[in-house]
Amino acid sequence: MNFELTSAYKPTGDQPEAIAQLTEGVLEGVPAQTLLGVTGSGKTFTIANVIANINKPTLILSHNKTLAAQLYSEFKGFFPNNAVEYYVSYYDYYQPEAYLPSSDTYIEKDLAINDEIDKLRLAATSALLSGRKDVVVVSSVSCIYGMGNPSDFYNNVIEIERGRTINRNVFLRRLVDSLYMRNDIELNRGNFRVKGDTVDIYLAYSDNLLRVTFWGDEIDGIEEVDPVSGVTIAPFEAYKIYPANLFMTTKEATLRAIHEIEDDLTKQVAYFESIGKEYEAKRLYERVTYDMEMIRELGHCSGIENYSRYFDGRAAGTRPYCLLDFFPDDFLIVIDESHVSVPQIRAMYGGDRARKINLVEYGFRLPAAMDNRPLKFEEFESMAKQVIYVSATPADYELVQSEGIVVEQVIRPTGLLDPVIEVRPSLNQIDDLMEEIQIRIEKEERILVTTLTKRMAEELTEYLLNNNVRCNYIHSDVDTLERVKIMDDLRQGVYDVLIGVNLLREGLDLPEVSLVAILDADKEGFLRSHRSLTQTAGRAARNVNGMVIMYADKITDSMRLTIDETNRRREKQLAYNEEHGITPQQIKKARNLSVFGNGAETEDTQKGTRAYVEPSSPNIAADPVVQYMSKTQLEKSMERTRKLMQEAAKKLEFIEAAQYRDELLKMEDLMKEKWPG
């Protein structure tokens, strides 16, 4: 089946040329291309058109779950008749196993799995193994983490068709081998029930039941039914039932794995004893022996993933299987926000290894645990045959990979221009800034000011407050959740000015901001590099009156690059608007935009056509089922939510952290209501 792009939007601005260039590059086998697209230029729509043109399975890689969810929603809208899947970590909460030698502290693994995401992950792998070409998988960096052998997964697919002869009990055993569990009382995802000649299977990767009806030893009927009403959704002549778990194995493989594990245990214990680590030897022997007993009796144990190398039949040091192994050879990878995503992919292996070294050296795990890991960056590169890097500020790596050839997309369908950039002397910069602030306040617009240090941010805030300017500051010492409120207050008009040290985060993508002031712009460094200055200047790119003022005593190379590039883009945007009679339109950003919305749209009133632009920002809302929890369960859920909130805040994912905060407050209110006092 081919991709079928469904959209009321038409490519405009730079989009047609970008689509043509990228499509040609992929079809000609170019290994790497870079799409340099400014914020709001409709990069997602461009990529959707490229996918439809090349008709290849595609992996869209995003650097966090929130953006992945937004992309998933958008691509579902573009390809409603094709397989658009979502593959991210299925943990709502995850505390990895770790050991801290300095304090002799062992931290046990703790987790909470999101059943819905688990279903979506299975749907993604099932779609890839179905053989269809029209598959788009939107993924986070989870795609490079270890999972089951795709061959084992595929070998456990059950193919049935009407009229085929198969004994019912044999069929039931096949279901059990595919890790479906029989439950005739309560049917949940991954279960099946038997009523006479009818077998109902709650597919692990779907919201529907599969009903298989037998007539003796012959399959008489196959149909998908609604699990609640029992109404038939669709009949089938043939059907493939995919396994209920990504990690498949056989009894023979399990016995072989146990034998190999016990052999390696003997060697590692002997090694510890030879270097005088009797305590570590004893600890390792007891832990692994207990795990083997659990696997023999129950088929699994806590931390079984640390033995994955044995179950997969891999040699020591070889890479694990991952989502990329489920794709055919001729697939395309699109790396969104590549300047962030590529370094993240590069860092995953090192972080995982650093944690596991202590577990191995102190006798908590066998050395084979090191092979349950994400891909090394070199391994990822070897599997990525064709890549499109997408970024407003591509890094040197992407430019080198694409041999300096960049496909530009700088025209916005809204007609908005890149902001005007002015350089002013740092002498009397605060007085000059005060004048500019007053001009914006009169127009009910907002201002961002970026400084080099926390102390400067605080002192400038105090000065502006003393001059009756409504303002606040954010930096790493400000409570992370308080930052969310401060930014929301800026949008609401509680503050007119927000001052910070690093204002590059997506949480500060604010259309109300018409002025960005960069103090000490000539101080070269991380916060004043070319890419940082470009990203900072981009904060004003969503406002019709967008302007950037750099206060400096000299123009550095980074400043010159940023100014020249912005002016070049602006000239191109102006020329396009004049040629096509387009008037720039201010973006109206919804305050509670759901990630499952299908984007924003703009209408060219002069021509009556619509064009697609990216939504201004994603926003995930948690919706847990807590009404019927016991007090203990609710307390545990609150603690997990608190940890998730703190983790999101540490990553400066402000919107996500705010949602967890709201969820936590609701649970606290529920706790007080159900158990007062």
Curated annotation (Swiss-Prot):
Forms a heterotetramer with UvrA during the search for lesions. Interacts with UvrC in an incision complex. The beta-hairpin motif is involved in DNA binding. It comes from the Bacteria. Residues 24-412 form the Helicase ATP-binding domain. GO terms for cellular component: cytoplasm; excinuclease repair complex. The keyword ATP-binding applies. InterPro entries: Helicase/UvrB_N, Helicase_ATP-bd, Helicase_C-like, P-loop_NTPase, UVR_dom, UVR_dom_sf, UvrB, UvrB_inter. A motif (Beta-hairpin) lies at residues 90-113. Residues 429-591 form the Helicase C-terminal domain. Its main location: cytoplasm. The lineage of its organism: Bacteria, Pseudomonadati, Bacteroidota, Bacteroidia, Bacteroidales. ATP binds at G37, V38, T39, G40, S41, G42, K43, T44. One of its GO terms (biological process) is nucleotide-excision repair. Keywords: ATP-binding, Cytoplasm, DNA damage, DNA excision, DNA repair, Excision nuclease, Nucleotide-binding, SOS response. It comes from Bacteroides fragilis (strain YCH46). The UvrABC repair system catalyzes the recognition and processing of DNA lesions. A damage recognition complex composed of 2 UvrA and 2 UvrB subunits scans DNA for abnormalities. Upon binding of the UvrA(2)B(2) complex to a putative damaged site, the DNA wraps around one UvrB monomer. DNA wrap is dependent on ATP binding by UvrB and probably causes local melting of the DNA helix, facilitating insertion of UvrB beta-hairpin between the DNA strands. Then UvrB probes one DNA strand for the presence of a lesion. GO terms for molecular function: ATP binding; ATP hydrolysis activity; DNA binding; excinuclease ABC activity. This is UvrABC system protein B. The keyword Oxidoreductase does not apply. Residues 635-670 form the UVR domain. It is found in: Cytoplasm. Belongs to the UvrB family.
